[in-house]
Amino acid sequence: RQRQMCIRDSLLGKNKFNHWASLAQVGLANAGTATEQICGIGIPALSVPGKGPQFTKSFAKRQQRLLGGSVSLCESKDIFHEKLLYLLKNKKFRVRQGQIGKERMGDPGASKIIADFITSKLK
């Protein structure tokens, strides 16, 4: 029981995304910002667009171009299965795809730098 609580406390809660996401080999993505976050920490993602108004096939295609090879659009279960197996079996390829995401998203902290810059211009 105590071990379960320790695991729970280390994975759940505010500011835990990087901790648990970094444990993954591949991310399954169906949301815009989460996809960019997981690719940004070097985890390649498989993108599965839904029927909702925001994460559509066209959005997923644009995001795939933005993030390069770090995210791969899967338009069917078969494609998803094929790409997932390939990523899991090919560590060198998986690591390279993850590196592309890190390069495309850049270092952490850009939002604060942008906000500080804007604030300085408004003074």
Task: State where each predicted segment sits.
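Nucleotide-activated sugar donor-binding and catalytic core shared by glycosyltransferases
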Residues: 1-4, 8-123
